[in-house]
Curated annotation (Swiss-Prot):
Origin species: Pseudomonas aeruginosa (strain ATCC 15692 / DSM 22644 / CIP 104116 / JCM 14847 / LMG 12228 / 1C / PRS 101 / PAO1)
InterPro entries given in the database record: Ribosomal_bL32, Ribosomal_bL32_bact, Ribosomal_zn-bd
Gene from which the chain derives: rpmF
Protein name: Large ribosomal subunit protein bL32
Keywords (A to Z) from UniProt: Ribonucleoprotein, Ribosomal protein
Example GO molecular function: structural constituent of ribosome
Length: 60
């Protein structure tokens, strides 16, 4: 097993963890329907940037 040679200080430990915070997802509101979706993704009702790009009934 790996064993540290010297104790890490609280400062060094916390500086290492400074990038571990969770970030929230980037959400967008669809222009035409007002529905919320992930950025650069088609909204659940098939719209993207104000245009209908996917028919809800199709299996594609």
């Amino acid at each position: 097993m790996a064993v540290q040679q010297n104790k890490k200080s609280r400062s060094a430990r916390d500086m290492r963890r400074s990038h571990d915070a969770l970030e929230s997802n980037a959400l967008s509101v669809e222009k035409s329907t007002g529905e919320v979706h992930l950025r650069h993704h088609v909204s659940p009702d098939g719209f993207y940037r104000g245009r209908k790009v996917v028919d809800k009934g199709s299996d594609e």
